[in-house]
Amino acid sequence: MDRLHTSSADWPDHLATQVVRVRGGVLQAAGQSDHVAEETPVALEFNGISHATMLVTPTHLDDFALGFALTEGIVGGMADVRGVELETRCDGIVVQVEIATSCEVRLKERRRAMAGRTGCGLCGVETLPEVVRDVAPAADSDALPVHNVLRAMQSLRSRQTLHDATGATHAAGWADASGEVVLAREDVGRHNALDKLIGALARQGIAPLPGMAVVSSRASFEMVQKTASAGIPILAAVSAPTALAIRLARQTNVTLLGFVRNTDATIYSHPQRIAA
């Protein structure tokens, strides 16, 4: 990637606001403050073409744009990305991504007009084939001890600084084979957090094997689709998966775990990757 101009530090990820609290059914005195997460309209443009508008926590927007481009199949890898630039406007932020001209056919195929709901990855998709698109199966990988998966989820919790401040964000983390989370991203939208993580992995040249993705949310169909698109073999979620997510995980050779909490977990697909 030749060019990367970002200044996400210009946009706060949370702010303080005046509140009136109720405690034990009793109104408390006015004048107290609370920290709340920011969400900002972020428009993604590829080669000058407006593609999608999302509500996003305004941090790591370069990673978000890269991860979105990768998991949506707009680009095949970082070699297809020429540069990323961020522009602040009065009504939000525009992320301009320059991609190889050879990717423009895929861009037109995946073009969607998305707006409105936080982390709504499927808003604006017009046909079912656009939703259930072909994704290459994840590569086979060695089994990881279940203890390392549990450790990874516990490690992710310690990386959720924005959630600690606001209680409003999801996190997605990348853990190595030992279960240590080496990279994490947060966002008000769970899909956005995962896109940020995948973009960061690609930008930093971190291979998806061996290791796992851990998320502080449920595992929806699109979370599995993004995981498989990135070649990540294991997805561990703190909450439940959906039936469609399980079917896709089985189809794409992704090991899907849900209810990963403390010393417990449920494995829904490809349990051969999890060892005692």
From Swiss-Prot:
**A biological-process GO annotation:** Mo-molybdopterin cofactor biosynthetic process
Please list every transmembrane segment annotated in the UniProt record, as residue ranges: none
- Could you give a GO molecular-function term held by this entry? sulfurtransferase activity
Query: Which catalytic residues are annotated?
Result: 120
Q: Name one GO cellular component term.
A: cytoplasm
Kindly give the InterPro entries that the UniProt entry links to this protein: Cytidine_deaminase-like (IPR016193), FdhD (IPR003786)
Give coiled-coil spans as residue ranges. none
- Give the keywords, sorted: Cytoplasm, Molybdenum cofactor biosynthesis
Where does this polypeptide localize? Answer: Cytoplasm
Which superkingdom does the taxonomy of this entry point to?
A: Bacteria
Function noted in UniProt: Required for formate dehydrogenase (FDH) activity. Acts as a sulfur carrier protein that transfers sulfur from IscS to the molybdenum cofactor prior to its insertion into FDH.
The similarity annotation says: Belongs to the FdhD family.
Q: What is this protein called?
A: Sulfur carrier protein FdhD
Q: Give the species this sequence originates from.
A: Bordetella parapertussis (strain 12822 / ATCC BAA-587 / NCTC 13253)
Gene name per UniProt: fdhD
